[in-house]
């Protein structure tokens, strides 16, 4: 089965590897471009100390995301089919709940939440991961 066919069939192994790679790239980007991410979230009219804290926060967020990507890839490679599907389903649900809570919490702070074009892709990707796991759990 080709990679495209595996993706179309929502093979949990393929989906988990893709999600892991996306998470790794996102974490690396956030870490490398922490200054840009901090400015987009907190604005440019903040003190030097606040800017340093905001950039550090963004770097930590990037570092936090990278192991999640590695965990997703590792689970895709080492678990058997049934457990991989279960992991895809439940890890997707947990991350979806986390992101919902995260974005709701961020609205209560001075942090400028990302615009809708940055919010939809993670939710869509996690939805695909959850559905992939659900579809293959019973097989």
Regions found by a protein language model. Name each.
Residues 124-139:
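Membrane-water interface at the C-terminal end of transmembrane alpha helices
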Residues 13-20, 62, 92-96, 119-122, ...:
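Residues within membrane-spanning alpha-helices of integral membrane proteins
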Residues 99-119, 134-137:
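Membrane-helix boundary connector in multi-pass membrane proteins
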Residues 70-89, 93:
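Juxtamembrane helix-break-helix junctions at the cytosolic face
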Residues 5-8, 77-85, 110-112:
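Membrane-interface helix-boundary motifs at transmembrane edges
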Residues 1-26:
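Cytosolic juxtamembrane helix and N-cap/initiation of the first transmembrane helix
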Residues 23-26, 94-103:
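Aromatic-anchored segments of alpha-helical transmembrane domains
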Residues 21-64:
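Hydrophobic transmembrane helix segments
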């Amino acid at each position: 089965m080709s990679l495209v066919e595996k993706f179309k069939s929502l093979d949990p192994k393929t989906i988990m590897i893709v999600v892991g790679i996306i998470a790794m790239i996102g974490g690396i980007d956030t870490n490398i471009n922490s200054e840009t991410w901090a400015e987009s979230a907190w604005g440019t009219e903040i003190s030097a100390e606040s800017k340093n804290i905001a950039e550090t926060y963004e770097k930590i967020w990037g570092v936090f995301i990278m192991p999640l990507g590695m965990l997703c890839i590792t689970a895709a490679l080492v678990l058997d089919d049934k457990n991989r599907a279960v992991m895809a389903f439940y890890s997707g649900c947990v991350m979806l709940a986390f992101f919902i809570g995260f974005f709701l919490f961020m609205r209560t702070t001075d942090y400028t939440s990302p615009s809708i074009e940055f919010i939809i892709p993670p939710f869509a990707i996690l939805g695909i991961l959850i559905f992939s796991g659900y579809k293959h759990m019973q097989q």
